[in-house]
Regions:
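The feature marks proteins involved in alpha-glucan
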Residues: 1-21, 59-173, 177-180
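Hydrophobic faces of well-ordered beta-strands that scaffold small-molecule active sites
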Residues: 150-152, 207-209, 270-272, 340, ...
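Conserved alpha/beta catalytic core and glycan-binding cleft of carbohydrate-active enzymes
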Residues: 357-517, 521-522, 530-532, 567-570, ...
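Structural beta-strand segments of beta-rich domains
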Residues: 22-26
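Substrate-binding/active-site clefts of carbohydrate-active enzymes
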Residues: 157-335, 341-364, 369-370, 381-382
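Glycan-recognition and catalytic regions of carbohydrate-active enzymes
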Residues: 8-11, 511-528, 546-602
Length: 602
């Protein structure tokens, strides 16, 4: 147990800013601070420095608080915290060092805030009633049995950045593009459907959206450069670059809710990609609020880096464990989010995840909220040894309704993602991987990869990481990768067949099927296996390509429809082909074999 964890008290009361009927309360947790000052601003523009300052009073258990008699909805704010210099080992570059009294003063936004202005530099007091789009109070998640679940992953920008997608120019790359219900390719009347209309026709039940909390790699004022967003700044605030006005903290909330409501109206549930394992930088808001507490340290005193991003968050520490659980419940309750995908879940402790499961279950309809993540990390971390992390070794301690991505299925079907030209079952090595693929189809029962129930296993062959499925197939099914047909314009019938079989295996396997958006129309990134900060053009969904390759989309549509009609695919019940003649038991079977022409189900 670390010194700060052993010596600092845990605070159980509300944190952040709370707008009450007759006033506003500001509360932060900063046990080592000797003074905390609240600064109030009229605007979110960091160039406008005119402010009113108020000293917070020390409360119980390491908290500081100020109660105002005014309802300060729409007011922006930040904090100035003063610490003994000895309490701050990682001094921010903008800190004020007071040599005379041996203190350091640090500015920070509120890490517990629910709204903020441009680039998250100032937090905002929010009146949630004013952020509800029309019809929000009647919004309900679609009732979808877990056995019918089919997950489609996308990015807010990728979904609508293509100028041929038919989205209004002001909605491209924004939350509001999901509210455009009748878009077509190039706005042609009766043309190929794009956006929400396309999703409804495809038949997927859940859309997993890559990070849409406030992240740091994109300038919200300009919307550039492009980034996936795996660099959190404010966990409980929507990303401003996806809104039509990043300076007004209420707009991003309203438009994010509108996106979710539109998906619900289309019969689709929403899964939020969350990144509680690290933050944008070592010098983050939580570290500024309580230096040395929220981030893990290695044995030499530096930041632990199992995430590969410079800092690992200490989920096992009580106040960050509480932060994670509170954050998940908040997004589910306030935004009607239907599920959570945990980035590098192998860096989070199983106790926190299990507690989150219990708290989400308490919400109305909460038991239907999905939880799953990546059971691995980028490198070793330095968690407290009494806690078990949710990696492949520790995942057996997870609640039976917390799942994980099955890389065993992925690599067996298409080949190891770490070896770009290594084929799998569908693209060159059917004999080598046949037994593993049989295990995949059966949900890995009887193997080390099995879960407490088959619903814990996310079956997939493509996600935002690594090569797209099409690019992997192109690289492994041609002798010269320099001439890979990424555009799918030549003689690629054998590659299309491999793509189709891969989809068939995933969509008839036990567990929950998952796909990267565009997999169903041979999405390409031209061999780029990590496009997180490449151009919007490389990453966006090419709706013209979708129209051109609609025959493959029809194959996916058929598979999805068959799976949804037959829950036996989900729970993995299998038949013996030599079953007794005349048996009355309901039976379902699929047969797959690798061929060089598009397959049919048998």
């Amino acid at each position: 147990m670390s010194f700060v964890e052993a010596s600092w008290p845990d605070y159980a009361g509300p944190l952040g800013s709370q707008l009450l009927d007759h006033g506003t309360v500001f509360t932060v947790w900063s046990p080592s601070a000797v003074a905390v000052t609240l600064r109030l601003f009229d605007t979110s523009d960091p160039k406008d420095n005119s402010s009113t300052t108020v000293a917070l009073e020390r409360a119980q258990d390491g908290a500081w608080q100020h109660r105002s008699a005014e309802r300060l909805a729409g007011t922006y704010y930040d904090y100035m915290l003063t610490f003994p210099a000895s309490a701050v080992s990682n001094v921010p570059s903008d800190a004020i060092i007071n040599a005379a009294d041996g203190t350091v003063t640090i500015r920070t936004a509120d890490p517990w805030a629910k709204a903020s202005g441009v680039n998250g530099e100032r937090s905002m007091v929010v009146d949630f009633d004013s952020t509800n789009p029309d019809g929000w109070l009647s919004d309900r998640s679609p009732d979808i049995p877990v056995s019918q679940t089919v997950i489609w992953e996308t990015h807010v920008g990728d979904f609508s950045n293509d100028p041929h997608g038919g989205f209004p120019k002001g909605h491209r790359g924004k939350f509001l593009a999901f509210t455009d219900a009748h878009t077509t390719l190039d706005n042609q009347p009766g043309g190929f459907p794009t956006g929400i209309a396309y999703l409804k026709r495809l038949g997927v039940t859940h859309v997993q959206i890559m990070p849409f909390y406030d992240y740091g790699s994109v300038d919200e004022a300009t919307g550039s450069p492009y980034n996936w967003g795996y660099d959190p700044v404010a966990y409980d605030v929507p990303e401003g670059s996806y809104s039509t006005d990043p300076y007004d903290g209420a707009v991003r909330i309203r438009e994010c809710k509108a996106m979710i409501a539109a998906l619900h109206q289309a019969g689709i549930r929403v899964i939020m990609d969350v990144v509680y394992n690290h933050m944008y930088e070592n010098d983050n808001e939580l570290e500024r609020m309580a230096p040395g507490y929220f981030c893990r340290r290695d044995d030499a005193g530096g930041f632990a880096n199992g995430s590969g991003c410079g800092n690992d968050m200490a989920s096992e520490r009580p106040m960050f464990s509480r932060f994670i659980v509170d954050s998940l419940v908040y997004w589910a309750r306030e935004y009607h989010v239907d599920g959570f995908r945990f980035d590098l879940m192998g860096l989070l402790d199983t106790q926190t995840l299990n507690r989150a499961r219990k708290e989400l279950d308490k919400l109305p309809g909460g038991e239907s909220i999905l939880m799953y993540g990546e059971p691995w990390s980028a490198d070793k971390t330095n968690a407290e040894p009494s806690f078990t992390l949710a990696d492949k070794q520790g995942r057996k301690l997870l609640d039976a309704r917390i799942g994980w991505f099955c890389d065993e299925s992925r690599d067996s079907i298409k080949g190891n993602v770490m070896l770009g030209r290594k084929p799998g079952y569908v693209n060159g090595q059917p004999s080598e991987f046949a037994e593993l693929v049989r295990h995949a189809l059966n949900g890995w029962r009887g193997t080390e990869a099995q879960g407490k129930q088959v619903g814990q296993i996310i079956q997939y062959v493509s996600a935002h990481d690594d090569l797209t499925l099409w690019d992997k197939l192109c690289l492994t099914m041609r002798d010269d990768p320099a001439h890979a047909d990424y555009d799918a314009t030549g003689d690629v019938q054998d590659i299309l067949a491999a793509n189709a079989i891969a989809a068939g295996l995933v969509l008839t396997s036990a567990g929950l099927p998952f796909m990267l958006s565009g997999e169903e129309f041979t999405r390409t990134k031209y061999g780029c296996d990590n496009s997180f900060d490449r151009s919007a053009e490389l990453n966006w969904l090419d709706w013209g390509r979708a129209s051109r390759l609609s025959s493959l989309i029809e194959w996916y549509r058929t598979l999805i429809a068959v799976r949804k009609a037959h829950p036996d695919f989900y729970d993995g019940r299998r038949i013996a082909l030599d079953s007794p003649e005349g048996s009355s038991q309901r039976r379902l079977a699929t047969t797959w074999r690798c061929v060089r022409t598009p397959p049919r189900m048998a």
